[in-house]
Amino acid sequence: RRLDLLKLHNFEDVLGMVRLIPILSYRKIPDQIRVTDLEDCGSELLIRGRLSVLLPAPIRLRLEGIYCILERETFRLSIPLTPGPLRYYLKDYRKYDYLPQEERVVPKTLAKYVDPSRKTPATPQTCFLSRDGRFFPLLGEFQTEESAYLFRKSYEDRRQYLLLDDTAKSTSFLEQYIRTFLLHFFPQEPSDPS
């Protein structure tokens, strides 16, 4: 009789666990996205797409102003856009002079033709190129191509931005960006090297 009770108890546990299996689909989300639509709304970028996995319940995510809704087999993501100008800081500031009246830098090879009273040696804080446009925030772990220009509002600002251009609107780029966002919520287990 006790053995029958134990089997019944374990059977009920197993039945309950079977109902929990769909929850595992959430961990697969970062690798299951496909962008299907992009809408530039001026102050935000709206991205819609499909998931290759069926979610048992909707979920809403927010991180650093980015908002995402995942529901059944679809997702919607809203990325806030920051208007420029923003600054791209040059690393080799010793090769430049700063023109305070124009708020810009020029290479020392060209600065030799500028009146000395109108220039000063560039510092890390003054050695930047300004760029107008609209920019979207990068998440800390997001990897961009080495050639990408990463902009900031000021030298002290640790938050980096990328110019919203055709490259940033490409499907492959957006899917990589969304995957990085989702990995904050659904971290992947390290793969077994063996």
Region locations from a protein language model:
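DEDD superfamily 3′-5′ metal-dependent exonuclease/proofreading module
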Residues: 1-194
